[in-house]
């Protein structure tokens, strides 16, 4: 994980830009620098993952052109070898050094061909144009805004831009900026033809593509570990990785000191795959003391994002403080592809598919945002195998009638895909889903709600919530989060499109809390 900063103007000093960059030093604690160029400034804070020597420090320059990138370019060694055969030379082992040669070869077409999680800014010396781009899902963050002089600025996080741009805007995923315009190079959720193969063929493809997605993300020069909740998704990632590596992996789980639900399942998985497992216990006091820090790191007021981030932030904090790890593989993006508890209520296959596409397109505002910020705030890099582009494209193209829960078990295709591998205990593979914010302990969400209820009187709540026209708070908990958000990001609420909620237009989903606990089909989930 790194931090990038670009300003296409020179009406500020280099020292001022250095100050803006240092607001996200935790993203790149290994080295930081701001370079003045012919068009403005480029800043980079480095967390060394590939090519650990100083030669891998950015920006990279070639024939007057520049690039900065927070990303992982998968398969870069093969790309690098091909470029070397064409006469290109490289100074480092960094994967991102291939970007300028790739741009010279393919121009703007480069972005649609990258197998990567990335956010980058590139200056083309020949055309004098500034270019920025972001991966199709938005796994790596990127924001932009305009200074008082009308010059554009780009940054990894909103906090880099607060106070000196007019409005902090989210850079759209799957897009590039060129010559003052944003161009969509791929809508990853769009389907150009459905797969109507039988279940056995579909599940084999799911198996093989997810396995390859995990394998790609095991490539790192820095030490890596795994977040293991004990739920299906993170357990699969860990089990696949352990099977590939044929050696013990390092896994980490977190739970409340009072009623942790998932810790026993995480330990069962860790023991089964032979992992070096660490449990982190959190308390009510730690959750409440960390709340403001977490909201500042997230730059959101969304209820479910914040709830789910409390455990993730605290386990990552422990990993940062007590280990040498720099990379963590996580289980995000499975729900959006295969379904949440609430998608059991989808009225039709078409409705399920439409909802999945919506969730994939909004990932960068919610689950992917959470994974990035909770890890980056603790100088760790998130890698998300379920976000592998080939995997996402395939699952989105599977006939939605086969993805509907008509099997009596959610995520049936994913479970079935690994049924014969025996890399997980059967009870884990077929366990009911529980939301992470609930699975760390039901008491955590209850503690947050109770704290908010006591924080405001009913009169204060009614008065304060009316201050906000956009995404108006509707509970004391949501008001508390919004007030903390506004303290650090005043007037920037539109960075978040809305509160994450189940599809209220569906029967059984018209609820006022994002937790699956309020759904009629929760059943044995979270037990």
For the regions a protein language model found, what residue spans apply to each?
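Short, amphipathic alpha-helical segments that act as regulatory/interfacial helices
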Residues: 6, 100, 104, 314-320, ...
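Peripheral terminal appendages
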Residues: 157-159, 200-201, 209-224, 439-527
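Mid-to-C-terminal catalytic subdomains of enzymes
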Residues: 325-330, 334-355, 362-473
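ATP-dependent adenylate-handling ligase core
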Residues: 258-316, 322, 339-353, 373, ...
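Amphipathic alpha-helical segments that form well-ordered structural scaffolds
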Residues: 98, 209, 269, 394, ...
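Hydrophobic (often cysteine-bearing) scaffold residues that line and stabilize catalytic clefts
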Residues: 13, 92-95, 114, 199-206, ...
């Amino acid at each position: 994980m790194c931090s990038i900063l670009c300003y296409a103007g020179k009406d500020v000093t280099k020292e001022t830009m250095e100050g803006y960059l240092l607001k996200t030093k935790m993203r790149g604690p290994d080295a930081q620098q701001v370079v003045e160029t012919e068009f403005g400034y480029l800043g980079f804070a480095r967390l060394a993952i590939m090519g650990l020597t100083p030669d891998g420090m950015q920006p990279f320059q070639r024939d007057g052109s520049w690039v900065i990138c927070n990303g992982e370019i998968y398969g870069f060694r093969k790309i690098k070898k091909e470029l070397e055969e064409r006469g290109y030379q490289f100074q480092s082992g960094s994967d991102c050094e291939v970007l300028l040669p790739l741009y010279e070869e393919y121009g703007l077409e480069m972005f649609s061909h990258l197998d990567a999680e990335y956010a980058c800014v590139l200056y083309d010396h020949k055309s004098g144009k500034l270019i920025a781009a972001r991966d199709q899902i938005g796994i790596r963050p990127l924001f932009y805004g305009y200074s008082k002089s009308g010059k554009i600025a780009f940054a990894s996080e909103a906090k880099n831009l607060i106070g000196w741009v007019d409005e902090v805007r989210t850079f759209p995923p799957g897009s590039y900026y060129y010559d003052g315009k944003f161009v969509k190079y791929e809508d990853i959720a769009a389907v150009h033809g459905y797969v109507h193969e039988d279940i056995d063929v579909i599940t084999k493809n799911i198996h093989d593509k997810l396995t390859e997605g995990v394998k790609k993300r095991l490539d790192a020069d820095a030490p890596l570990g795994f977040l293991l909740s004990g739920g299906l998704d993170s357990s699969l990632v860990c089990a696949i990785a352990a099977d590939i590596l044929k050696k013990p992996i390092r896994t980490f789980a977190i739970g409340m000191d009072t009623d942790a639900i998932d810790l026993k399942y995480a330990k069962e998985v860790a023991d089964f795959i032979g992992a070096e497992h660490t449990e982190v216990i959190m308390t009510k006091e730690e959750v409440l003391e960390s709340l403001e820090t977490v909201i500042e790191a997230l730059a959101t007021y969304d209820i479910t994002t914040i709830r789910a981030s409390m455990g993730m932030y605290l386990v990552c904090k422990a990993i940062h403080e007590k280990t040498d790890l720099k990379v963590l593989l996580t289980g995000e993006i499975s729900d959006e592809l295969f379904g949440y508890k609430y998608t059991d209520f989808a009225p039709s296959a078409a409705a399920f598919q439409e909802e999945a596409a919506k969730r994939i397109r909004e990932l960068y505002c919610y689950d992917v945002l959470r994974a990035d910020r909770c890890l980056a705030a603790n100088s760790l890099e998130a890698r998300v195998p379920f976000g592998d582009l080939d995997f996402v494209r395939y699952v989105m193209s599977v006939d939605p009638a086969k993805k509907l829960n008509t099997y009596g078990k959610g995520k049936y295709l994913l479970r079935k895909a690994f049924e014969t591998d025996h890399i997980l205990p059967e009870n884990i593979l077929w366990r009911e889903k529980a939301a992470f914010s609930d699975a760390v302990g039901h008491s955590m969400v209850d503690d947050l709600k109770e704290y908010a209820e006591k924080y405001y009187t009913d009169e204060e709540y009614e008065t304060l919530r009316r201050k906000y026209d956009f995404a108006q708070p509707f509970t004391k908990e949501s008001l508390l989060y919004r007030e903390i958000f506004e303290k650090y990001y005043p007037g920037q609420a539109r960075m978040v499109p809305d509160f994450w909620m189940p599809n209220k237009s569906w029967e059984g989903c018209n609820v006022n809390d994002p937790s699956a606990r309020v759904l009629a089909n929760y059943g044995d989930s979270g037990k």
